[in-house]
Design a protein with these regions (language model features):
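Cytosolic, membrane-interface loops and tails of multi-pass inner-membrane proteins
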Residues: 40, 75-88, 156-172, 233
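Select subsegments of transmembrane alpha-helices in polytopic membrane proteins
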Residues: 6-11, 54, 64-69, 95-106, ...
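Active-site and channel-lining beta-strand-loop segments
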Residues: 23-53, 160-169
Length: 233
């Protein structure tokens, strides 16, 4: 039942941008800024109805998560052992959290985009009012922290968590690799937020990618180290 409630929440959150956009567009000019260059200058204006594109994309991404969750729920029902059932259930729960987090993050991004477009269109300006890249990076940082706290709850599987040849060796290598990976992704989130607050959105994005790359490399190396220790036992 918990997964069913979480899936309902995921779809409700995913639908909110569609509803908000439908209402907000009633008060918007027919032509609004649709795209900006790296410096925030508007390089394309378009019909306000184009604002529905992002909410529709959010719905399709949510559908993807819904189908993936369904696969694990089916695996749980058809599991031959209790261990397999628990692993599938755990993965389904984590995917629910991922789906909800993604819908919230993209939704907030869309609200900022709508607000910025509304202000700029009414003012007749040629420059973005809000640095959307900055907002996106901060939201990504928050999502990293949230996901990091849930990574350790995922049982061994082929979809969710730190999945290397070495981490998949057994439950012990999986648990230790994911615990370390969770710490790395949380630190990545914190560093991304701190960096972005004091820099531009573009700079924050570059540093976020660097942090992610370093976190990935360190986690993979640690996973191999844990595996080597495990096979020597």
């Amino acid at each position: 039942w918990r997964e069913k409630r979480m899936k309902k929440v995921m779809w409700i959150v995913a639908m909110i941008p569609v509803v908000v956009t439908s209402v907000v567009l009633q008060f918007m000019p027919d032509i609004i800024p649709m795209h900006h260059d790296l410096e925030g200058n508007t390089d394309r204006w378009g019909s306000k109805t184009e604002s529905f594109i992002f909410p529709v994309i959010i719905l399709f991404i949510t559908l993807f998560w819904h189908l993936l969750i369904y696969v694990f729920e089916k695996k749980s029902k058809n599991a031959n052992t209790e261990k397999e059932q628990m692993e599938a259930k755990s993965s389904a729960k984590v995917l629910c959290v991922v789906g909800i987090s993604q819908a919230i993050m993209f939704g907030i991004m869309h609200y900022f985009i709508l607000y910025s477009s509304w202000i700029q269109a009414n003012a007749g300006g040629e420059h973005a009012v809000i640095d959307i890249a900055k907002v996106s990076c901060i939201l990504c940082g928050i999502i990293f922290i949230v996901l990091g706290n849930f990574m350790t709850k995922a049982k061994r599987n082929a979809v969710v968590g730190v999945r290397t040849v070495w981490s998949m060796h057994n439950d012990n290598t999986w648990r230790k690799s994911n615990r370390f990976g969770a710490i790395c992704i949380i630190i990545t989130g914190l560093l991304t937020i701190i960096t972005t607050v004091f820099t531009s959105g573009m700079t924050g994005t570059i540093f976020m990618l660097i942090y992610l790359l370093l976190a990935t490399i360190v986690t993979v190396v640690y996973s191999k180290k844990i595996y080597d220790k495990e096979i020597k036992k």
